[in-house]
Curated annotation (Swiss-Prot):
It comes from the Eukaryota. The modification Phosphoserine is found at S42. PROSITE patterns: EF_HAND_1, EF_HAND_2. Residues 55-65 have a biased composition (Polar residues). It comes from Bos taurus (Bovine). The gene is CABP4. GO terms for molecular function: calcium channel regulator activity; calcium ion binding; transmembrane transporter binding. Residues 1-12 have a biased composition (Basic and acidic residues). CDD domains: EFh. This is Calcium-binding protein 4. It is found in: Cytoplasm; Presynapse. Phosphorylated. Phosphorylation levels change with the light conditions and regulate the activity.
Amino acid sequence: MAEEQGRGRHGPDPAPRPQKPPVEVLASSSGAEGPPLMRKRSSKREKGLRGSRKGPSSSGEQTPMQGPEAPGSSKNPSRTREGQEGPIPSASGLAPRRQSHRHRPGPQHDAAQRMYGPLLNRIFGKDRELGPEELDELQAAFEEFDTDHDGYIGYRDLGECMRTLGYMPTEMELIEVSQHVKMRMGGRVDFEEFVEMMGPKLREETAHMLGLRELRIAFREFDRDRDGRITVAELREAAPALLGEPLVGPELEEMLQEVDLNGDGTVDFNEFVMMLSRH
């Protein structure tokens, strides 16, 4: 009766709810892992794996260091390029040699220089005498600016006269020439003094700057019979005077064969020009 009054006073007791023991209790109370425990641990392991698979794309964590990749791997483009360009340095190393070989004078050019070099130096070098055609050219230019026909031209006309001959003096060169003429020549020059001034400029021409006229003059020095071809006999005859020393038979034939491009045993004017213009 007292118990019923107590229940009525406090209300009916709620039905007891089944409670799950905590994981620690299950782990300590059972000697073996039950199915619920295994499922819970399995889900934790899967979570960890999913988190590790997300990597830096979902979090700001740094990517773990990786081992060295293969040279052809696409993940390392710089190494891929190096791997692809590996043989290129050897090829580029050969390029300068091929280029220098192309521009290096060959034996034919050396033979032509030995054969024609002394001749060109004697005819067109700095120590040579001016030829009749060059003197005529200087005379024509001088007379053009000798307007009063007294045999002199003034220093003011020297620059224009030099340009008529094909030279383009700088302002400093004109000042030096004008001062020299004014101080030592009374402000004007005659033809002989004009030749002394212009002669060195004409003598500075080299073999690769020669025109067709000069090349034909040089060719005629060797072509004694004027048949348009230089033979071994003509070379032997011209060698002492033009080359400064006689040449023996084997040396003459060897030089002629190196310069003879078409193999006919002689050197024509075209072969002569090609040998002198080759660098």
